[in-house]
């Protein structure tokens, strides 16, 4: 610690920014030292300091009372009567705090009132969040029965206590303490999951076909729809109305959603082409993208299709080829390797 020694020797003549104290006490000889009075409460700490003997540790600096009335502000550790109360009478306010851990009586009263208020608030919160003690937990935590289940006794004890942690409020998810927010929230109250409507009775296949006023895209007695196996991949009504995946995607999505919502069919089943028909049509498309009427009639007779089916298949196949060419062009132009 030679820095402090150097500071003490040259502090009166020069300014040293690296020193803690560079003002000589001889410059202020007329002013009394503010640390002249003895320490009233010395704070000691269990750990030892490793500093030099002439350097005072920071944690052991005495806390002095500057301008405070000792009788008015008793210390916390001085619950021994007149020594902390101040004066020779020994009956100051500090002497009355000995029974309350060193606090004055008004401090003890305030602390007791605060503790009572906190205990009352905690008890109110527990009453609001916890279920009443008189109810059975199987009534509170009863699991919802499945929609299609037959009425009868519950299957096993799983429905008795499915959730043992908190009572479920009216919203079905959060505890009962959150019901106040749902009461103040705008909009209709939470109604819970609604059971799906019962499905309509399925109609027989023959009645659905006869009752449909429209004929399919492959209409005609000699259509191969009757020959197609049900396990074959459906590609659209003769791929003429839907094409080989060429119909607009919005229309296909609407058809899927309508078929999912309404259980009864409002149109005939979209029958796919057989592999033989697709192979012959693709072979003709490879040689002639646009087919003339004679070749179209010849194909329709050979494949047992209608003239309209062959015409619409070629239209959709041209649109598919156009899309494939566009995607191919984007791939090759966007790829820096080509």
Curated annotation (Swiss-Prot):
Residues 239-250 have a biased composition (Gly residues). One of its GO terms (cellular component) is chromatin. InterPro entries: DUF3528, HD, HD_metazoa, Homeobox_CS, Homeodomain-like_sf. Residues 186-204 have a biased composition (Pro residues). The keyword Ribonucleoprotein does not apply. GO terms for molecular function: DNA-binding transcription factor activity, RNA polymerase II-specific; RNA polymerase II cis-regulatory region sequence-specific DNA binding; sequence-specific double-stranded DNA binding. It is found in: Nucleus. Pfam families: DUF3528, Homeodomain. Belongs to the Abd-B homeobox family. This is Homeobox protein Hox-D11. The gene is HOXD11.
């Amino acid at each position: 610690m030679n820095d402090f020694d150097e500071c003490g020797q040259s502090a009166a003549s020069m300014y040293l920014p690296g020193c803690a104290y560079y003002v000589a006490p001889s410059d202020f000889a007329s002013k009394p030292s503010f640390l002249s009075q003895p320490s009233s409460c010395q704070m000691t700490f269990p750990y030892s300091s490793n500093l030099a003997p002439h350097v005072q540790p920071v944690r052991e600096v005495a806390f002095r009372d500057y301008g405070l009335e000792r009788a008015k502000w008793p210390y916390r550790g001085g619950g021994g009567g007149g020594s902390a109360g101040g004066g020779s009478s020994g009956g100051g306010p500090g002497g009355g705090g000995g029974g309350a851990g060193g606090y004055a009586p008004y401090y003890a009263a305030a602390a007791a009132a605060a503790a009572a208020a906190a205990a009352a608030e905690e008890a109110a919160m527990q009453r609001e969040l916890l279920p009443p003690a008189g109810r059975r937990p199987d009534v509170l935590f009863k699991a919802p029965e499945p929609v299609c289940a037959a009425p009868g006794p519950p299957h096993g004890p799983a429905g008795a206590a499915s959730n043992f942690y908190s009572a479920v409020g009216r919203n079905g998810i959060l505890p009962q303490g959150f019901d106040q927010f749902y009461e103040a929230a705008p909009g209709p109250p939470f109604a819970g999951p609604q059971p799906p409507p019962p499905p309509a009775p399925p109609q027989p296949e023959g009645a659905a076909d006869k009752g449909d006023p429209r004929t399919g895209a492959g209409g005609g007695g000699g259509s191969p729809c009757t020959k197609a196996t049900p396990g074959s991949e459906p590609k659209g009504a003769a791929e003429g109305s839907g094409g080989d995946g060429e119909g607009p995607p919005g229309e296909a999505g609407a058809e899927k959603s309508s078929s999912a919502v309404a259980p009864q069919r409002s149109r005939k089943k979209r029958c796919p082409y057989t592999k033989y028909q697709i192979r012959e049509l693709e072979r003709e498309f490879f040689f002639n993208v646009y087919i003339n009427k004679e070749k179209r009639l010849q194909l329709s007779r050979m494949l047992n299709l209608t003239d309209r089916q062959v015409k619409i298949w070629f239209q959709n196949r041209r649109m598919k080829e156009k899309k494939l060419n566009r995607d191919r062009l984007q791939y090759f132009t966007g790829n820096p390797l080509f």
